[in-house]
Amino acid sequence: MTDTNELFEDQTTALQNSAPIAPLANPQHTVSRGKFRSLTLINWNGFFARTFDLDELVTTLSGGNGAGKSTTMAGFVTALIPDLTLLNFRNTTEAGSTSSSRDKGLYGKLKAGVCYAVLESLNSRGQRVITGVRLQQVAGRDKKVDIRSFSLQNVPMSDSIISILTEQVGEKARVLPLADLKDKFDGSEVLFKQYHSITDYHSFMFDLGVIPKRLRSSADRSKFYKLIEASLYGGISSVITKSLRDYLLPENTGVRQAFQDMESALRENRMTLEAIKVTQSDRDMFKHLITESTNYVSADYMRNANERRGNVQIALEQRRAWYESKSKLELEQQRLIEFSREVADISENESGLEAEYNSANDHLNLVMNALRHQEKIERYQDEVAELNEKLEEQQIALEEVSEQVETAQARADDADDQVEELRSQMADYQQALDAQQTRALQYQQAIAALEKAKQLCGLPHLDLHNVEDYHAEFAAQADDLTDQVFELEQRLSVSDMAKTQFEKAYELVCKISGEIDRSGAWNEARSLLTAFTDQKMQATQAVALRQKLADLEQRLHQQQNAERLLAEFNQKAQTQFETAEELEGYFEQQQARLEDVEAELAEFVEVRSTQRQQREQLNQQYNQLAKTAPAWHTAQSALARLEEQCGEKFEASQSVMQFMQNMLIKEREATLARDELARREAALDAQITRLSQPDGSDDVRLNQLAERFGGVLLSELYDDVSIDDAPYFSALYGEARHAIVVRDLESVKSQLEKLDDCPTDLYLIEGDPSAFDDAVFTAEELAEGVVVKVSDRQWRYSKFPEVPLFGRAAREKHLETLKAERDEVSEQHAERAFDVQKCQRLHQHLSQFVGTHLSLAFQPNPEEQMQEIAAERTEIERELNQAAGNEQQLRTQLDSAKAKLQMLNKILPLVSLLEDETLADRAEECRAQLDEAEEDEQFVRQFGNYLTQLEPIAASLKSDPAKFEQLEQDYQQAKAEQKQVQQKVFALSDVIQRRVHFSYEEAIGSEGSALTEQLRARLESAQREREQARDQLRQAQAQFTQYNQVLTGLRSSCDAKTQMLQELIREIDDLGVRGDIGAEERARSRRDELQQRLSQQRSRKGYLDKQLGTIEAEIDNLTRTLRKAERDYHTQRELVVQAKVSWCLVLKLSRNSDVEKRLNRRELAYQSAEELRSISDKALGALRTAVADNEYLRDSLRASEDSRKPENKVAFFIAVYQHLRERIRQDIIKTDDPIDAIEQMEIELSRLTNELTSREKKLAISAESVANILRKTIQREQNRILQLNQGLQNIAFGQVKGVRLVVNIRDTHAILLNALSNGREEHKDLFDSQKLSFSEALAMLYKRVNPHIEMGQRTPQTIGEELLDYRNYLDLEVETFRGADGWMRAESSALSTGEAIGTGMSILLMVVQSWEEESRRMRAKDILPSRLLFLDEAARLDATSINTLFELCERLDMQLLIAAPENISPERGTTYKLVRKITNNQEYVHVVGLKGFGQQ
């Protein structure tokens, strides 16, 4: 707990132990307090038109549940605070309602139509004030209520509220709408006003004393409503207790006023700073205007100078271009003649060459077609031979498969017959019912078999005795027939082979020679085979003949090419060479000429390379100097400005450094003088500040101690003494002149030990500050001082001070002297500060010049060296141009010699061919031989394979195998006889097998079962053999079909390829060309050679045509260029003449106005026209803005924008210079040059800015002052809370015997106050920062001393503003004295319901009283506001507690509206009995009003 809190506890204990005193809240006012007179409800639920007269103290609404008590109070609250965002009558809101319901308990209390809730009050002035609201239900599901507030004034006392709001319509009354109510009082003395905002409505009520506090915002309304709600529902409201600071503690204005004073002084100082900034803006305008004007005009000035120089160069170049165009035109005309002649020659040769090329191309196509046909023929011959072989193989395989099919068919038929016979036997046996029948059946079958054998064999006498003999006989015949069939098969096979060979040989002969008679096939085959040997021999010679013909044709072609080349060479070289000796001699001559020209050209190239190197070196030097030249000119300009500023002429860099050193010494001396004057000025300011204090004290701690001890400074008591007496009293008290006068020294003595910060010597004098005398010392006044008898053994002599502490008049007189002296010292300080600033600026310029331009400023002029380099470069360019012409002539001679040598290199190897005259005949003879060989070769290639196959089988053609058909018939007949004999053998075998059955004629049937089994086994065996035979037959047939299909495919393929082969042979015969690989190569090389020659001819002709077109176009262009060059030259010459006239005018104007040196900025001469125009355009844009307010400069600038008159820009620059010269304040700046004026303005403004900035620091409020103000405010409010506690000390509710308010300073904020007071140096970085406001610095300090506290998302400015409010430093709580527990925090959980209601009501009474005192200054002095609180359900209070409330109301002159059940009847005040009744299906509330009936 801090010291302040301990002091507060001590004062609280003292007040509680003292005798009861009358509360400060009940003074004897001469002004009566306003009172609420009545509440009127119109068209509410149960109250159509009811007025409740309110008692001056307590009005009680008594009734049962649902009688309308809460509705009445709701009407009162609604009229008092018509804010739908706040109103919420909880006890009537439906249970479980959600936020979606907007009723808030009000909608259900109203009836349909217009409703009113009106309050009538009588204020301190005796005025009748009627305020209220019009309510109306809004149709819809949200249960909205529309509220409109209004007021009435000057209403006579005789008019009732009901008569005002209703009108009589027959026997009924009608509620007037708000518009009709307004119309009713239009033109009368009654003032009707409708309010569109709740704030205006409450402002009216506050001004007339209806409510205790001005409710400016929704937050204030919320506080007021929460106060009413807390009183309405009773108890200790947590909403109120948690924010008692906002309800009880008024807003502090001390710190705000201090900050306003500080801001006022700072505002004045900053206005001066703003004026300085305006002057700085003038300075900036000076600087901006002169800079932009210089850029604008000088860039255009240098651009015109460059353009003038460039125009002269362009004129010279155009004249040179004119002459060059003439020479080029003559050269192109000569080229046109030469190229036209060559094109004519090429056109003559092109047609013949094109015909040769077409012929060669056709021959190549024929050869290639022949080769392709030959390849196809060979491929098809191979394929046909291969297919024939496959066809023969397939034919043999097919015949074998056919025989297998026939054998399988016969075997299958026999198997079928055997199976059918066995099945018939089986069926017969099955029909027998017993063995006897079976045997009989077998016997019958045996007889049938015997008959069958007789018929089949033709033996009618066949029986069991001779059956075996006949079987043996027929078996022998079968063997003989089998041998005969085998023999016929062999003969048939041999005959078939001979037939096959004959057919094959005959087919081959037909393929070679075509269709011939079979009888003449042998002769034709013999002749073909005889010629085949010679043809093969002749075909082998075709390769050698072909090679030989290729060589001859190649030599013949080379001979023709040599003749062509020789003709071309003679034509181009203008010679008539025919022999090899002549050509070789000319070749050696041209080779020697080529070597001479190459040597001469190499020498020219070397010389040119050397000259180009020299030119590159000169260009590099020139470019380097050109880069250095702008910086050199800039350095020269800076040197000139520096010499003007320093008044010195610098010859070398050493002189600049020496002057810079001297300037440093001068600056040091001026700085020492300025600092001495500053110290004197600060000392005078300190004296003036001390004497300006009300008490003249220079120690602020004395004021704090005086406030803490409750005393007054001695100097304040003597503040009104005269000037003559002031020295006497100052000397009388001596060192005790800073003493503090207190009422009781003993009461202060206990606090002295607790002092932490106080002066070394603290004097305390006991006395009454209101009646203090000087009888403290025994003194005697002397001439120069006072002798004071401190004690019998100690005297003190004090001289009269020159500046007495006592007496405001004496201090003010001395203040005038000090201020005059300070003004003089300040003026001297300003002069010295100006000198220091000037030295510093000059030193800054020197440093900048040394760092930037010193290395170049004293070097020679680079432009002179550039002129020398330009002259050397021009001479080298002339020599290079001359060498280029000579080089071109040599290269032409070199190209001509190389072309001739190239043609001779092609001709010389072919000279020997030119003398061979028989080459063409030999080539023709060889070609004829080759044709014959190629025919034989083609025949061998086509039919060689057939003849090779024919040769081994040709002998088969001698005899035709015509008896093959007869042999085949014999074979078939023998095979049929063999089959008949085999059937007879089988029938006889069957009879033999059934021999036993013949004995069954009379046998018993004991053997039938065995016979059946035997037949079944034979049947199964026969069926298996039949299935096997059928499978073999199907396989054989499938194989036969497959082989037959393959054979058919091979035959069709062979026929197709044979036919294609015949067609290819006919086609190659039609072509008439026998192609081979060499023929194709020869034809292709011939075609390519002719194509290349033709392409070369055409390319050359195309090139020449293009060149002719180009030359013609070039001639036209050159002709136009020549005319244009001549015209441009004359135009440029006129332009140069005109520019010279304008330039002379510009020079004359600039030289006469002495601005040429500022415009002729040589560093700009090295920039391009676009860059200079960009500089000028940017400056023009800035100047348009800068001179927008100056009509003269604006017009001059507009005139200068004419690019045809550059002299107008110079005139504008002169006008700007003159304008700035006129604006220079000669009383401050001693120069006529605007640039110098800018420099002096910068120095002066910098000094003024520094002085005002330091003054602003002095004006800023200190953290210590803020801490003192906060402490005083907190102490004052603690005392006020103590006074409020006196009004609560005699309150008792049940076991509660006392209620009090406890106020404490928060520990974190107490630490902050201590840091503000004592940590000035420690936290200097925060409050001396220029970047932080005082509020932000305060917040940062709070965070620094309380690092454990989180600031959240709030800004330091917001936190700092909260920390300037003293209420945030305090914690305010309510405590009750209850039984043996003593003083404890008031909480609803620790108190009974009645005690909580009484305690809460007591607190609310104090809040209302506090609000009245807080708003006293804002309210008229003749107005005391009404006081009224509510209490619903007062049954929770006993009679004693209710009487206590009555006493509180009487003591505090306050009204109270209570709702109680029927069994509660207060003894005093007005009581209304409310009973809800229903009459004629209409519900209403019956009201009976009584006064004090409880006593009876």
From Swiss-Prot:
The keyword Acyltransferase does not apply. Residues 694-811 are annotated as: Flexible hinge. One of its GO terms (molecular function) is DNA binding. Residues 1082-1101 are annotated as: Disordered. It comes from Actinobacillus pleuropneumoniae serotype 7 (strain AP76). Residues 1082-1091 have a biased composition (Basic and acidic residues). Plays a central role in chromosome condensation, segregation and cell cycle progression. Functions as a homodimer, which is essential for chromosome partition. Involved in negative DNA supercoiling in vivo, and by this means organize and compact chromosomes. May achieve or facilitate chromosome segregation by condensation DNA from both sides of a centrally located replisome during cell division. NCBIfam families: PRK04863.1 (NF003422). It is found in: Cytoplasm, Nucleoid. This is Chromosome partition protein MukB. Gene3D superfamilies: 1.20.58.850, 3.40.1140.10, Immunoglobulin FC, subunit C (1.20.5.420), MukB, hinge domain (3.30.70.3500). Keywords: ATP-binding, Cell cycle, Cell division, Chromosome partition, Coiled coil, Cytoplasm, DNA condensation, DNA-binding, Nucleotide-binding. One of its GO terms (biological process) is DNA replication.
